[in-house]
């Protein structure tokens, strides 16, 4: 795809997002504030013994999230271990214990890290009853937690922040399921396959034979993108023509990735009674996205060497049907959200180009971030920003009329610390423990030296931020990485949720402070700039040393 076509694709994505973010955001606000339950929802509530009018305190909401997720891990793990006895197993054996644990954790945490080749490892029953179900409910849990935090800002003098079961069921049945049905049909029309054909042996034009896998791909592809999940039906993910056959399906999948995350700030603004607040959050997200995408595109278009110059850019690892701009747009959207899907190989990017997806995740995936996690991550950074502004002018910080006291800033700070600790400690242990280091360097790392370090840093960054993309040169299906990355995914998902829900409970219990002439306006460009600055500075101070040892050093050496 040439440069003009790539630019037109970017413009079309932007136009569609501008058109849909308001109605979709308003729809979600009405959905989560509604007191009406459908007949199907009432039946589910009776079945599971839930009173939809009964709300939960933040500890009760948290316990429900953890219990539901634990059951999800056990179910997905069990399906994998029993695969040989399940229908539509395609003759595939049970998945090994370590890989089953890693995969179960991966899909329940919305990470979708895949240390295996899906078409050669998972039968259709595991794909549909296990992985696809988690694609829906893990996304719904993320949105529910974000809505709980929004209620914390919107409510006053109350001890409750909603009902997890109501939020979960509404998010699944009213939002994700109907949108996925529509988008799956569109993807089928675009050439994405949907069948139960299994493996087909066909004769090639050269006179040989080839085994071609089939499967119910479109139905899983829809929620994979819409729920910012990212796990592919095939090993090549969206670079595979059965998942993403054309340039327009690639653009459509980018829209799916960004639709809910960019619409949730509008939901936030509607629920707190000031849509300008949501617009400010969208402005921050959009600015960071544009800068990151532009930088990545420049690095790839200006790849050094004879081959990149002849091809008009670094085409290694990219599909000819997409080209550079469509590939960098997809890669930026995938790593600035929590999707992690790929239509090009990030490990084959230039040194500085490969650094950009890593930085996108290190920012905390807040521009716009995952379904729900992007909004609550950005609101945590907004709390940090008003605290910094309060220190500068000597006033007690407040945000949306809620006082940001010691408890609130401690919770926000703990949230910020979780993923850097997981990334840096996980990477350090991979090289500090002699037995682990020998295994990593001898078995897992394909490229030694600076890029080998980058591969390990990328893996832990992806796992801790629940992204799921990878530098594919790293062989991750080993006992160390299956366990270490599994733990990173668990802690990276649920520790932040603990702090977010605790913050929601603390804010909901407060009264609203009247606005005065000294109140910091959080809907104006000045606050947008402050929030962008805090986001970038926190990331730079935390990760610059390891980036200097990896991709920056590699880029300077190339």
UniProtKB/Swiss-Prot annotation:
**What role is this protein assigned?**
Part of the high-affinity ATP-driven potassium transport (or Kdp) system, which catalyzes the hydrolysis of ATP coupled with the electrogenic transport of potassium into the cytoplasm. This subunit binds the extracellular potassium ions and delivers the ions to the membrane domain of KdpB through an intramembrane tunnel.
Mode of membrane association: Multi-pass membrane protein
Q: NCBIfam families, from UniProt?
A: kdpA (TIGR00680)
What keyword terms does UniProt attach to this protein?
A: Cell membrane, Ion transport, Membrane, Potassium, Potassium transport, Transmembrane, Transmembrane helix, Transport
Source species: Clavibacter michiganensis subsp. michiganensis (strain NCPPB 382)
Q: Check the record and name the InterPro entries matching this protein.
A: KdpA (IPR004623)
The family annotation for this protein states: Belongs to the KdpA family.
Assembly behavior? The system is composed of three essential subunits: KdpA, KdpB and KdpC.
Give me the Gene Ontology terms describing cellular component: plasma membrane
One Pfam family name is KdpA
One function term, GO molecular function aspect = potassium ion binding
- Where is the chain membrane-spanning? 1-21, 59-79, 85-105, 130-150, 179-199, 245-265, 279-299, 374-394, 416-436, 484-504, 527-547
Source superkingdom: Bacteria
Q: What is this protein called?
A: Potassium-transporting ATPase potassium-binding subunit
Q: Where does the record place it?
A: Cell membrane
Identify the gene encoding this protein. Answer: kdpA
């Amino acid at each position: 795809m040439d440069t003009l076509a790539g630019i037109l694709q970017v413009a079309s994505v932007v136009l569609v997002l501008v058109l849909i973010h308001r109605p979709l955001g308003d729809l979600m606000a009405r959905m989560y504030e509604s007191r009406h339950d459908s007949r199907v929802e009432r039946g589910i509530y009776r079945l599971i013994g839930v009173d939809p009018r009964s709300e939960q305190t933040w500890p009760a909401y948290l316990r429900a999230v953890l219990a539901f997720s634990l059951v999800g891990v056990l179910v997905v793990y069990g399906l994998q271990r029993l695969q040989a006895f399940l229908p539509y197993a395609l003759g595939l054996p049970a998945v090994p214990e370590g890989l089953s644990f890693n995969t179960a954790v991966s899909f329940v945490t919305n990470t979708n890290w895949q240390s295996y080749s899906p078409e050669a490892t998972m039968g259709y029953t595991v794909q549909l009853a296990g992985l696809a179900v988690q694609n829906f409910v893990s996304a719904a849990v993320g949105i529910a937690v974000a809505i709980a935090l929004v209620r914390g800002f919107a409510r006053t003098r109350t001890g409750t922040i909603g009902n997890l079961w109501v939020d979960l069921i509404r998010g699944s049945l009213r939002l994700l399921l109907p949108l996925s049905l529509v988008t799956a049909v569109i993807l089928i029309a675009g050439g994405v396959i949907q069948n139960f054909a299994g493996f087909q042996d066909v004769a090639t034009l050269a006179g040989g034979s080839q085994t071609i896998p089939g499967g119910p791909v479109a139905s899983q592809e829809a929620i994979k993108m819409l729920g910012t999940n990212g796990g592919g039906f095939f090993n090549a993910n969206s670079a595979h023509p059965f998942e993403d056959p054309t340039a327009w399906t690639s653009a459509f999948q980018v829209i799916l990735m960004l639709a809910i995350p960019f619409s949730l700030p509008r939901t936030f603004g509607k629920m707190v009674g000031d849509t300008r607040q949501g617009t400010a959050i969208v402005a921050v997200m959009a600015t960071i996205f544009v800068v990151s995408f532009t930088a990545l595109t420049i690095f790839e278009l200006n790849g050094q060497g004879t081959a990149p110059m002849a091809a008009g850019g670094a085409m290694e690892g990219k599909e000819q049907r997409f080209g550079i701009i469509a590939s960098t747009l997809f890669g930026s959207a995938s790593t600035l959200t929590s999707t992690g899907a790929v239509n090009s190989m990030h490990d084959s990017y230039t040194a500085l180009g490969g650094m950009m997806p890593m930085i996108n995740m290190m920012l905390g995936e807040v521009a716009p971030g995952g379904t729900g996690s992007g909004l609550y991550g950005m609101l945590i950074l907004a709390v940090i920003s008003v605290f910094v502004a309060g220190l500068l002018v000597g006033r007690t910080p407040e945000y949306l009329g809620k006082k940001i006291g010691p408890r609130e800033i401690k919770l926000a700070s703990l949230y910020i610390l979780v993923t850097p600790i997981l990334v840096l400690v996980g990477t350090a242990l991979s090289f500090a423990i002699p037995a682990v280091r020998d295994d990593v360097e001898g078995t897992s790392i394909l490229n030694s030296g600076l890029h080998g370090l980058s591969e390990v840093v990328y893996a832990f960054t992806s796992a801790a931020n629940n992204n799921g993309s990878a530098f594919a040169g790293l062989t991750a299906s080993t006992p160390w990485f299956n366990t270490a990355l599994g733990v990173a995914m668990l802690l990276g998902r649920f520790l932040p949720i603990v702090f977010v829900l605790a913050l929601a409970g603390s804010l909901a219990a407060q009264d609203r402070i009247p606005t005065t002439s000294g109140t910091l306006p959080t809907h104006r460009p000045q606050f947008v700039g402050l929030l962008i600055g805090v986001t970038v500075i926190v990331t730079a101070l935390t990760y610059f040393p390891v980036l200097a040892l990896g991709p920056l050093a590699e880029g300077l050496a190339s």
